């Protein structure tokens, strides 16, 4: 994922979480905040309780790939996604549908725009 699409700084994470705009399901919690950019930015948090490094990295890869294919549907938002324990056993396609569920629930999905 390109640098301009990532949220890395702890201060940015704290600011978005402090706004308390969130939605959740059994696998993910999503915190979000409007930004002034033409695109979304994504921050991912996977707790050490979810497994060893290679398991956490796999979860993060699944999340990044899911958002890469949906970046035209979610614009002008900073999104923090926190993985819960239920995501550990899910295959890739179910991770995507679970993220879709939370995004639709939070009304962050927009009509597809080419770009």
What role is predicted for each listed range?
Residues 1-115:
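Positively charged, solvent-exposed patches that mediate nucleic-acid binding
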């Amino acid at each position: 994922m390109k640098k301009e699409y990532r949220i890395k700084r702890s201060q940015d994470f704290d600011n978005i979480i402090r706004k308390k705009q969130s939605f959740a399901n059994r696998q993910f919690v999503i915190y979000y905040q409007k930004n002034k950019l033409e695109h979304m930015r994504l921050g991912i948090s996977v707790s050490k309780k979810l497994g060893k490094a290679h398991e956490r990295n796999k979860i993060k890869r699944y999340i990044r790939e899911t958002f890469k294919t949906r970046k035209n549907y979610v614009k002008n938002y900073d999104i923090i996604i926190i993985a819960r324990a239920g995501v550990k056993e899910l295959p890739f396609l179910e991770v995507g549908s679970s993220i879709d569920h939370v995004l639709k629930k939070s009304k962050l999905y927009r009509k597809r725009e080419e770009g």
